[in-house]
Each structure stands twice: as C-alpha cells, then as structure tokens.
C-alpha cells in the first residue's frame, strides 16, 4: 500500500513538472521594438513608457514572453525613421530565436489624444499576423490601460 502511494505521488510530480515545463517552453517569444513617432511630437519618456507597458502586457499574457533588448539599437535607429521592418532586422530577430516582432507607433491626434497602433510580424516570413490600434488620452494614467487593451487584441489574434 505504501509503495503504491509513493508511486502515485512520484507519477503526479512527474506529470505536474512536465506540464509546467511544456507551458514554459511553448511560450511564444515576441521582440518589442522602440515606439515609432513619425511626427516627432511625442516625448521620449512617453515612448519609453508605451514600450514598457506593451512589454509588460505581452509578457503577462498567457503563452507569451516579451523581449526588449538594447542590442536592437542599431536596427532601431533606421527603424525609427521609416517604421518598416527590414529584412536585416527580421534576420537578426530570428537569430535571437524570436518568433515574432511587435512594431508599434504613436500618432498625436490633437493636444490631448493619441492613436496607438501596433502589429505583430512573423519573423520567419515577414507576414503581419495581428494588427490593432486604440485611441486614448496622451496621459500616463490612460496609456497603460490602452497598451493592455492593444496587447490583448494582438495576442488574441495569434
């Protein structure tokens, strides 16, 4: 009886560990780039906050890991000017074993509101797999909620 109990506990521990490991290793890796501001009117701190909030929202979504890396800097300099994902950037992200790249843009609509747009691009083929946008007040208190909503719309599509 005691042997059966020990075997049952060991089996349960093995199944629990493999389930947790599978959930951990099956997470989709998303590289999150700098926020594009084609107008040049958005404060750098606001763009950093938006990127941070999107990284948090993606990372806190079940099945996803968000990555923001300083090593993207050289690519982001060119990316900030165009808003396009170059083949060099896709190749670099693939080498880092990232499945997706999140590209975001903030556009001032007036003095109080902005449009946050984002798309998730598959690094293996360059296809946009999800795209969404949200209009919000350009205030920190509203931006986090808008980023959470944006991330929810994006990860629900892949």
Predicted regions and their residues:
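Residue-level signal for short, function-critical loop segments
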Residues: 36-38
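Conserved beta-strand segments of the P-loop GTPase G domain that flank and frequently precede/overlap
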Residues: 33-34, 104
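Short, Lys/Arg-enriched, disordered terminal segments
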Residues: 1-5, 22-23
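Sec-dependent N-terminal signal peptides
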Residues: 4-15
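C-terminal/domain-edge helix-coil "capping" segments
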Residues: 22-31, 46, 57, 92-95, ...
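N-terminal segment of the mature soluble domain
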Residues: 27-32, 41-84
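Hydrophobic alpha-helical membrane-insertion segments, chiefly the h-region
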Residues: 17-21
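Short, solvent-exposed, polar/charged sequence segments at loop or secondary-structure edges
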Residues: 61-103, 109-115
């Amino acid at each position: 009886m005691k042997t059966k109990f020990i075997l049952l506990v060991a089996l349960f521990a093995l199944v629990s560990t493999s389930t947790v490991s599978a959930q951990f290793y099956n997470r989709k890796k998303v590289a999150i780039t700098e926020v594009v501001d084609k107008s040049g009117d958005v404060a750098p701190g606001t763009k950093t906050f938006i990127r941070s909030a999107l990284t948090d929202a993606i990372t806190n979504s079940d099945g996803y890991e968000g990555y923001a890396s300083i090593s993207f800097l050289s690519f982001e300099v060119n990316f900030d000017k165009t808003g396009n994902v170059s083949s060099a950037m896709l190749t670099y992200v693939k080498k880092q074993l990232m499945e997706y790249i999140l590209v975001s843009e903030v556009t001032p609509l007036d003095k109080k509101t902005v449009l946050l747009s984002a798309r998730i691009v598959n690094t293996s083929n360059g296809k946009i797999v999800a795209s969404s946008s949200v209009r919000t007040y350009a205030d920190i208190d509203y931006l986090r909620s808008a980023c959470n909503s944006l991330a929810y719309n994006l990860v629900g599509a892949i």
